[in-house]
Regions:
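Glycine-rich beta-strand-turn "strand-cap" elements at beta-sheet edges
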Residues: 2, 9, 40-49, 76-107
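A short alpha-helix capping/helix-coil boundary motif
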Residues: 4-7, 56-57
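Short, surface-exposed ligand-recognition loops at beta-strand->loop->(often short) alpha-helix junctions
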Residues: 9-22
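Short, charged/polar surface micro-motifs in flexible loops or helix N-caps
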Residues: 12-13, 47-48, 58-63
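An amphipathic, aromatic/His-enriched active-site/gating alpha helix that lines ligand/cofactor pockets
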Residues: 24-25, 29-37, 56-90
Length: 107
Protein backbone atom coordinates (compact mmCIF):
# COMPACT_ATOMS: atom_id res chain seq x y z
CA UNK A 1 0.00 0.00 0.00
CA UNK A 2 1.17 3.49 -0.80
CA UNK A 3 0.31 6.88 0.72
CA UNK A 4 0.41 10.43 -0.56
CA UNK A 5 0.60 13.05 2.19
CA UNK A 6 -0.40 16.47 0.91
CA UNK A 7 0.48 19.36 3.22
CA UNK A 8 -1.88 22.28 2.74
CA UNK A 9 -1.93 25.75 4.27
CA UNK A 10 -5.28 27.46 3.97
CA UNK A 11 -5.83 31.17 3.87
CA UNK A 12 -6.51 32.48 7.39
CA UNK A 13 -9.65 30.93 8.89
CA UNK A 14 -10.38 28.92 5.72
CA UNK A 15 -9.39 25.43 6.93
CA UNK A 16 -13.02 24.42 7.48
CA UNK A 17 -13.87 25.51 3.93
CA UNK A 18 -10.80 23.64 2.66
CA UNK A 19 -11.88 20.47 4.48
CA UNK A 20 -15.39 20.81 3.05
CA UNK A 21 -14.01 21.22 -0.48
CA UNK A 22 -11.92 18.08 -0.06
CA UNK A 23 -14.91 16.14 1.25
CA UNK A 24 -17.48 17.45 -1.24
CA UNK A 25 -15.41 17.86 -4.44
CA UNK A 26 -12.17 15.89 -4.15
CA UNK A 27 -13.20 12.65 -2.42
CA UNK A 28 -15.73 11.83 -5.18
CA UNK A 29 -12.91 12.22 -7.75
CA UNK A 30 -10.58 10.04 -5.67
CA UNK A 31 -13.20 7.30 -5.33
CA UNK A 32 -13.29 6.97 -9.13
CA UNK A 33 -9.52 6.44 -9.40
CA UNK A 34 -8.13 2.94 -9.95
CA UNK A 35 -6.41 1.69 -6.82
CA UNK A 36 -7.76 4.36 -4.45
CA UNK A 37 -8.33 2.97 -0.94
CA UNK A 38 -9.00 5.78 1.55
CA UNK A 39 -8.67 9.50 2.31
CA UNK A 40 -8.02 10.99 5.76
CA UNK A 41 -7.97 14.75 6.37
CA UNK A 42 -6.27 16.14 9.49
CA UNK A 43 -6.53 19.75 10.73
CA UNK A 44 -3.80 20.88 13.13
CA UNK A 45 -5.00 21.79 16.61
CA UNK A 46 -1.93 24.03 17.08
CA UNK A 47 -2.28 25.88 13.74
CA UNK A 48 -5.79 25.55 12.35
CA UNK A 49 -4.71 26.80 8.91
CA UNK A 50 -2.51 23.69 8.44
CA UNK A 51 -4.19 20.65 6.92
CA UNK A 52 -2.83 17.23 5.96
CA UNK A 53 -4.66 15.16 3.36
CA UNK A 54 -3.57 11.52 3.36
CA UNK A 55 -4.66 9.37 0.44
CA UNK A 56 -4.05 5.62 0.46
CA UNK A 57 -3.49 3.65 -2.74
CA UNK A 58 -3.09 -0.04 -3.51
CA UNK A 59 0.18 0.58 -5.38
CA UNK A 60 2.70 3.32 -6.11
CA UNK A 61 1.66 3.05 -9.77
CA UNK A 62 -1.97 3.85 -8.88
CA UNK A 63 -0.90 6.96 -6.94
CA UNK A 64 1.43 8.06 -9.74
CA UNK A 65 -1.33 7.62 -12.33
CA UNK A 66 -3.58 9.89 -10.23
CA UNK A 67 -0.74 12.42 -9.89
CA UNK A 68 -0.29 12.55 -13.67
CA UNK A 69 -3.99 12.50 -14.52
CA UNK A 70 -6.18 14.25 -11.97
CA UNK A 71 -4.01 16.02 -9.42
CA UNK A 72 -3.62 19.32 -11.32
CA UNK A 73 -7.39 19.63 -11.61
CA UNK A 74 -7.77 18.86 -7.89
CA UNK A 75 -5.13 21.47 -6.99
CA UNK A 76 -6.94 24.08 -9.09
CA UNK A 77 -10.20 23.32 -7.26
CA UNK A 78 -8.51 23.97 -3.90
CA UNK A 79 -6.44 26.99 -5.02
CA UNK A 80 -8.97 29.71 -4.01
CA UNK A 81 -8.68 28.77 -0.31
CA UNK A 82 -4.93 28.00 -0.23
CA UNK A 83 -2.29 30.38 1.11
CA UNK A 84 0.63 28.42 -0.40
CA UNK A 85 1.23 25.67 -2.94
CA UNK A 86 0.54 22.16 -1.61
CA UNK A 87 3.56 20.02 -0.70
CA UNK A 88 3.25 16.34 -1.68
CA UNK A 89 5.26 13.60 0.00
CA UNK A 90 4.91 9.89 -0.62
CA UNK A 91 5.33 6.90 1.67
CA UNK A 92 5.08 3.14 1.49
CA UNK A 93 2.73 1.82 4.19
CA UNK A 94 4.36 -0.86 6.33
CA UNK A 95 1.90 -1.17 9.22
CA UNK A 96 -1.81 -0.44 9.58
CA UNK A 97 -4.48 -1.53 12.03
CA UNK A 98 -7.22 -0.49 9.61
CA UNK A 99 -5.96 -1.90 6.31
CA UNK A 100 -4.58 -5.32 5.48
CA UNK A 101 -0.87 -5.05 4.75
CA UNK A 102 1.30 -8.02 3.73
CA UNK A 103 5.07 -7.60 3.42
CA UNK A 104 4.73 -3.86 2.91
CA UNK A 105 2.09 -4.29 0.18
CA UNK A 106 -1.68 -4.34 0.17
CA UNK A 107 -3.03 -7.81 0.87
Amino acid sequence: MFTRVVELTSKPRKSRELSSLINDKIVPILKKQAGFVDEIVLVSDADSDRVLALSFWKTREDAERYQRGQYNSVRETLQPVLETEPVVRTFEVHTSTGHKIASGKAA
